């Protein structure tokens, strides 16, 4: 099933050494989960490194770290209470500690092939620090890209506005750095709900962070872990070129049983592959968006038994035509059939397709968030106006001109004593109140 990432074979080798610079609560959690990925590579059990940068000191306590030697935490002193979803505070905190952050980057990421800045868009610390982190890595000539989560529509208006504001700034400068991987939280949330209907709400964060880490880790293994079946190959250097391509990067995966791959009648599985390409693993794309891609690649992995039957001229020709049809204007689009010699018995009949498409425009999901912001503002204005008018109408209709009758003054009566008449001018005039 497309996007259903399971743990890849433990014997795999990574293609590129990634470093993860986590910003804010969301970005730190993703970066830490990526650094938690394990392999059985000798002397490299934990192949990735992470630097976690945050204001709120309590957030660090929520993050699980399997190997402390691969993770560095930077507490932005003076901002321990957090940024309260105010990006200006997050930016100020990063700038104040930028020297310390950069020194840590030099130490921890010296041997890294590529750095991912991870951030949950919409908050204060990560969203605020993001542009300054981009400037820092850009000024010092690092190869880097962005791993950003998009908020769900259910988030508060301020969160949606913070996210779109940063996306606009990034889009204006996206040619200056590598790929942007967007994670649609709405998509992952729906997937989590479908797969775990009885799960607790707080389990989603752990699920999504692991899902993101698995997706990136698996594609980094595919390009370096299996035996090429033909001369066509998608190796680590080509993968590096893809993720260094400016624009948005889409990852996709599809698993099929070999009996679903009828090369005499390819329409069925090519349709499924096309749907997987558009659905993606982390966010949805549209066919028109794919057509504007700059680079694409398709890797196919199966067991030795199935490879000898499946990887014929007809099948590979169908794959080439399929990718050409979906990404017609790319600079490169290799088709790479692989053999997994360590396939488990239960997966001998499975064929896995992995695609990477780079240089894409911003997806429709960003436009949907902007539409949601507009809708909320319009409905809020209408609601406030309606309520305000109702109150004013009542207030102006209220008649407070009540005439009060002045009580007659009672005459005193002392019994048999002669009645004394009180003169009217002996009583002071009562001062009227004025409102």
Swiss-Prot record:
Which reactions is this enzyme annotated as catalysing?
Answer: GTP + H2O = GDP + phosphate + H(+)
Q: What is its EC number?
A: 3.6.5.-
Q: Could you confirm whether the keyword NAD appears in this record?
A: no
TM ranges? none
User: What keyword terms does UniProt attach to this protein?
Assistant: Cytoplasm, GTP-binding, Hydrolase, Nucleotide-binding, Plasmid, Plasmid partition
Q: Which GO terms describe its cellular component?
A: cell division site; cytoplasm
Its main localization is cytoplasm
Top-rank taxon of the source lineage equals Bacteria
Which residues bind GTP per the record? Answer: 25-26, 124-126, 185, 209
The protein's enzyme class: hydrolase
Annotated GO molecular function terms are:
GTP binding; GTPase activity
GO biological process assignments:
cell division; plasmid partitioning
Start and end residues of each stretch annotated as Disordered: 403-435
Location relative to the cell: Cytoplasm
What is this protein's function per UniProt? A tubulin-like, filament forming GTPase; the motor component of the type III plasmid partition system which ensures correct segregation of the pBCXO1 plasmid. It is essential for plasmid replication. Binds GTP and forms filaments. The filaments seed from a DNA centromere-like site (tubC)-TubR complex which extends to surround the TubZ filaments. Highly dynamic filaments grow at the plus end and depolymerize at the minus end, a process called treadmilling. TubR-tubC complexes track the depolymerizing minus end of the filament, probably pulling plasmid within the cell.
Quaternary structure and partners: Forms filaments. Binds to the TubR-tubC protein DNA complex.
**Family indicated by similarity:** Belongs to the FtsZ family. TubZ subfamily.
Entry's free-text remark on domains: Consists of two domains: a nucleotide-binding N-terminus that hydrolyzes GTP and a C-terminus domain necessary for polymerization. The domains are bridged by a long, central helix. Interactions between the C-terminus and the following monomer drive polymerization.
Name-wise, this protein is Tubulin-like protein TubZ
Q: Which gene encodes it?
A: tubZ
């Amino acid at each position: 099933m497309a996007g259903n990432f399971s743990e890849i074979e433990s014997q795999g080798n990574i293609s590129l050494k990634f470093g993860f610079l986590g910003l804010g609560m969301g970005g730190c959690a993703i970066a830490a989960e990526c650094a938690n990925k394990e392999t059985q590579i000798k002397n490299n059990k934990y192949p990735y490194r992470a630097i976690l940068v945050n204001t709120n000191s309590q957030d660090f306590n929520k993050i699980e770290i399997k190997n402390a030697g691969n993770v560095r935490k930077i507490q932005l002193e003076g901002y321990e209470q957090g940024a309260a979803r105010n990006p200006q505070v997050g930016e100020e905190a990063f700038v104040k500690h930028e020297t310390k952050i950069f020194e840590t980057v030099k130490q921890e990421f010296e041997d890294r092939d590529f750095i991912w800045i991870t951030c949950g868009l919409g908050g204060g610390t990560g969203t605020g620090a993001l542009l300054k982190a981009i400037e820092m890595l850009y000024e010092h000539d690092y190869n880097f890209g962005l791993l950003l989560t998009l908020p769900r529509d259910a988030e508060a208006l301020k969160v949606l506005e913070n996210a779109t504001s940063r996306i606009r700034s990034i889009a204006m400068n996206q040619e200056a750095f590598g790929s942007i991987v967007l994670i649609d939280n709405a998509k992952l949330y729906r997937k989590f709900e479908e797969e775990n209907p009885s799960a607790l709400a707080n389990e989603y964060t752990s699920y999504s962070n692991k899902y993101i880490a698995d997706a990136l880790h698996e594609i980094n293994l595919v390009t370096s872990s299996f035996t090429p079946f033909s001369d066509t190959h998608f190796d680590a250097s080509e993968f590096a070129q893809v993720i260094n391509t400016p624009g948005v990067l889409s990852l996709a995966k599809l698993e099929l049983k070999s009996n679903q791959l009828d090369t005499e009648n390819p329409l069925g599985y090519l349709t499924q592959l096309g749907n997987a390409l558009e659905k993606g693993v982390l966010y949805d794309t549209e066919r028109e968006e794919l057509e504007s891609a700059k680079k694409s690649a398709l890797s196919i992995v199966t067991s030795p038994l199935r490879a000898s039957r499946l990887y014929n001229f007809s099948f590979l020709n169908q794959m080439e035509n399929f990718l050409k049809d979906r990404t017609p204007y790319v600079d490169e689009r290799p088709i790479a059939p692989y053999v997994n010699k360590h396939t488990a018995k239960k997966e001998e009949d499975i064929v896995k397709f992995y695609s990477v498409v780079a240089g894409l425009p911003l997806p429709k999901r960003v436009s949907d968030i902007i539409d949601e912001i507009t809708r909320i503002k319009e409905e809020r204005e209408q609601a406030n106006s309606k309520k305000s008018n109702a109150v004013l109408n009542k207030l102006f209709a209220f008649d407070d001109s009540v005439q009060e009758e002045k009580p007659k003054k009672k005459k005193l009566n002392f019994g048999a004593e002669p009645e004394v008449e009180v003169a009217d001018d002996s009583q002071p005039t009562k001062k009227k109140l004025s409102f």
